Amino acid sequence: MFFSPNSKYNLKGIDDRFAQQIDIYPTLTDLIGYNKKIRSWGRSLVSDKNEDAIIVNSDAINEQMIIGNYIYIFNGKDVTGIYDRTDLALSKNLFSKNLNPEQKLGILKTKAWYQDYMDRVINRKLY
């Protein structure tokens, strides 16, 4: 829940987009008018940049990422599952040799996010 007296942000009603904790920092920087560069894997929920969301969850074995219309299961090396984003039970794995362009891009984004994250953890660059 966010508040701003600035009507520019139109913070009334319910926003049904997927969001997560990593979106708080960039959202707050926009709300307070901070316009210097920041490092975040999240996105501002009040920006008009229309940034794509990447929702990340981990069970300490696999990363689960929601990107676009799909949920990707990643084991640290390979994507092992692709599910429709409405298939929250992960019951129908769509992973196949005939991936559509969105799924191929989602796999690349999954691996890129993980590589960037691990590089920053290992090299102590989480700033």
Please give the residue ranges for each predicted region.
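Substrate-binding rim/cap in mid-to-C-terminal beta-strand-loop elements of soluble/periplasmic
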Residues: 1-34
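Phosphate/adenylate-binding glycine loop and adjacent helical scaffold
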Residues: 36, 41-127
